[in-house]
Amino acid sequence: MIVAKKEVKTDLWVYDLLKQADIQLDAQGSDIKEINEALKTASKKGTGNVGFPEYVGVVKDYLLVIEDKAALDKHIKLDDKNCISIEVNAVRDYAVNGALFYAKHLARNTTYKKILAFGVSGDEKKHKISPLYVDETEFYRELPEVQSFISFNEDNIDEYYTREDIKDCTSG
């Protein structure tokens, strides 16, 4: 019960960050039919059942996916090759792992070619926000941590994409 309450607080804090950045994403699903259809088979347990990230939506031609966890120690789990683990337990229990899972699932099951996934953990005082770029081939790249979502609103997202040189790293 206490964990659930902390998760809700984290969800609300992330919602506030999105609002401050003037980004409107949907919680636990999507109003966009194509995304909602894809999420019908996005269970993090790998069962093929429905699964929803905390927030998902579109800014320009970018699909944004956010998975959050209240505990900082549930931010990311790496495998023995120092890559983001895709094991079911890691995907279910860790913010970055879950965000990557949803981003790859959406890359496979929608027409979106540019996906920014965010693993968020902690709270207003102490937190981590880790963006990942995932393209339509499911290639992913970890990007530098950010403090807010301001770089990802309609006014700034193209500049962020260019500044982080994402295009160059994905064009072969």
Question: Predicted regions span which residues?
Answer:
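Glycine-rich loops and low-complexity Gly/Arg-rich segments
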Residues: 90-93, 141-146, 156-157
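Generic alpha-helical secondary structure signal
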Residues: 19, 106, 137, 164-165
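Intrinsic-disorder-associated interaction segments
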Residues: 3, 7, 139-142, 150, ...
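Non-catalytic nucleic-acid substrate-recognition regions in nucleic-acid-modifying enzymes
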Residues: 148-172
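Short, low-complexity, polybasic intrinsically disordered segments
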Residues: 123-152
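A short, conserved, highly charged catalytic patch centered on acidic carboxylates
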Residues: 1-116, 120-132
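Generic alpha-helix signal with a bias toward terminal, lower-confidence helices
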Residues: 78, 132, 145, 161-164
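Intrinsically disordered, low-complexity segments enriched in small/polar residues
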Residues: 100, 131, 138, 158-159
